[in-house]
């Protein structure tokens, strides 16, 4: 078990999501795109595909939960699905603002470390901004660990586009890819333990 080897501490979770593109072409037998995939806008760019929501252990960087949804599903709606329930701290970006006030999180006794939106920091008075920026920078350094599994899956494993039709098959493949990403993340720790 990962807990026994010190690979999973379960004191805190970093939550994030990424969009994985699906083929948007209609040049197939059905003359249609995958009906389970949806399009969404991120900034001014439109994407068609699904979203991979993950929960990552703060101490080790190991992915403990993966949830796949259509791309148009809001990140905050899947937060409860990627928390394991035993964490003391939750770290998330500004897309999860207000998660601590949602009814599914009322009974959770955790410290919510959710980023403040950039516009709110810019609009605040200079003295308050000078206090908030170093705190936000420190929280961003913790949240940066959640990007490592995404880097491994999308860049090292080159999973930038979905290969199957439907959410079930693609989510199953994401579970496999993130499990393999966990092996890459803990490779040095496992090698040291095997030599001892």
Describe the role of every protein-language-model region.
Residues 1-111, 117, 175-181, 189, ...:
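Polybasic low-complexity intrinsically disordered regions
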Residues 59, 158, 184:
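Residue-level marker of positions within ordered structural domains that often coincide
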Residues 133-134, 139-141, 177, 184, ...:
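Acidic, contiguous segments within the catalytic cores of piggyBac-derived transposases
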């Amino acid at each position: 078990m990962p807990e026994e080897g010190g690979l999973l501490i379960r004191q805190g979770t970093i939550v994030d999501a990424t969009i994985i593109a699906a083929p948007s072409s209609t040049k197939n037998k059905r003359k249609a795109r995958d009906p389970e995939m949806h399009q969404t806008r991120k900034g001014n760019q439109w994407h068609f595909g699904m979203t991979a929501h993950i929960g990552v252990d703060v101490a080790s960087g190991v992915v403990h939960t993966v949830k796949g949804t259509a791309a148009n599903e809001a990140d905050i709606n899947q937060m409860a699905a990627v928390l394991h329930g035993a964490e003391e701290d939750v770290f998330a970006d500004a897309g999860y603002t207000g998660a601590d006030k949602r009814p599914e999180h009322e009974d959770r006794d955790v410290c919510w470390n959710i980023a403040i939106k950039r516009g709110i920091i810019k609009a605040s008075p200079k003295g308050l901004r000078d206090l908030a920026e170093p705190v936000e920078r420190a929280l961003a350094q913790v949240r940066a660990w959640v990007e490592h599994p995404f880097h491994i899956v999308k860049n090292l494993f080159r999973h930038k586009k979905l290969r199957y039709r439907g959410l079930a098959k693609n989510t199953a493949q994401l579970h496999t890819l993130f499990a393999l990403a966990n092996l890459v993340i803990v490779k040095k720790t496992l090698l040291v333990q095997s030599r001892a």
